């Protein structure tokens, strides 16, 4: 019965993705990570606490290396299981910078409930909420020779914007599949700070669907393919196809293909049972390369660890 329920839920998720696929496409208004599969709390609140122990995760991403003012993203996440691992909680702090003049700094909290739907499978339903400070130092922008004033850059913008999201995910010790909307706060309005400033800004819904599987080739080799589908209004749907090969649960090498954008190489090192490092090198088709570093520390010695999907 539980296996039938799990299969039914997964079919509903896939059907919903097909429905929204008709009208929605993806754009890059939300920062994305190449190593998202190792920090899925950042895109799906239902994942918080799924590793069974308190975990600290940090990611630093530098896009378009070598270009002055290139975008950078910093994220720090802490998550843990609660109530005998029937619930999960997480907190994420982040900072996104664009061309030195635009910055988003924020925090959000994630909470989920976990339901056992099969012998090894758990379905999690999660919500998140928080806020970020949207800062635009427009008066610092160099308008170039012969231009000292522009109405679009006449004043700075500094405001607090609420953030809320939702998601669900099914996990067992080999497989996962999840759907999430990282930010359900939608706005489409004029931001007026002074009489001659009329800066237009839009925030659309983003839909994420992700899935992955762990193949045990033998006791020393595991192959872990995964994919991520991103959809929003106003841009083409984007797919990330990823494969990682783990050797002796110690070191991993892999790669990804992001449709219409880039290919990338990844490597991870499980330095200790609690400490993991990762590095990703993005090679976009039309822009300079990008770098991303990842670190996770688990408090596994203080808390007994439960089963979790092996590639997280």
Predicted regions mapped to residue ranges:
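Bacterial Sec-dependent N-terminal signal peptides
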Residues: 1-30, 243, 299
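Subset of outer-membrane beta-barrel
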Residues: 28-312
């Amino acid at each position: 019965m539980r296996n039938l329920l799990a299969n039914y839920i997964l079919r509903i998720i896939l059907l919903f993705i097909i429905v929204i696929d008709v009208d929605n496409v993806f754009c890059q208004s939300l920062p994305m990570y190449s190593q998202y599969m190792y920090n899925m709390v950042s895109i799906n609140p239902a994942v918080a606490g799924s590793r069974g122990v308190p975990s600290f995760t940090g990611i630093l991403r530098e896009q378009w290396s070598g270009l002055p003012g290139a975008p950078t993203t910093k994220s720090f996440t802490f998550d843990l299981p609660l109530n005998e691992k029937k619930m999960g909680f997480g907190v994420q702090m982040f900072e996104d910078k664009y061309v030195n003049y635009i910055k988003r700094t924020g925090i959000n909290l994630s909470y989920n409930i976990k339901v056992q739907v099969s012998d090894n499978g758990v379905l999690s339903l999660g919500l998140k909420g928080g806020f970020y400070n949207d800062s635009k130092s427009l008066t610092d922008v160099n308008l170039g020779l012969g231009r000292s004033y522009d109405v679009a850059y006449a004043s700075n913008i500094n405001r607090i914007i609420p953030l809320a999201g939702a998601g669900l995910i099914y996990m067992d010790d080999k497989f996962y599949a999840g759907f999430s909307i990282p930010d359900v706060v939608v706005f489409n309005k004029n931001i007026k700070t002074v009489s001659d400033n009329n800066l237009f800004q839009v925030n659309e819904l983003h839909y994420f669907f992700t899935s992955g599987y762990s193949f045990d080739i033998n006791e020393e080799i595991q192959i872990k393919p995964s994919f991520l589908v991103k959809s929003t209004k106003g841009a083409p749907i984007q797919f990330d196809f990823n494969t990682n090969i783990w050797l002796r649960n110690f070191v991993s090498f892999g790669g990804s293909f992001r449709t219409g954008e880039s290919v990338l190489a990844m490597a991870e090192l499980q330095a200790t049972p609690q400490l993991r490092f990762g590095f990703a090198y993005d090679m976009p088709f039309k822009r300079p390369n990008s770098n991303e570093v990842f670190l996770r520390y688990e408090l596994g010695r203080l808390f007994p660890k439960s089963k979790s999907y092996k590639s997280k």
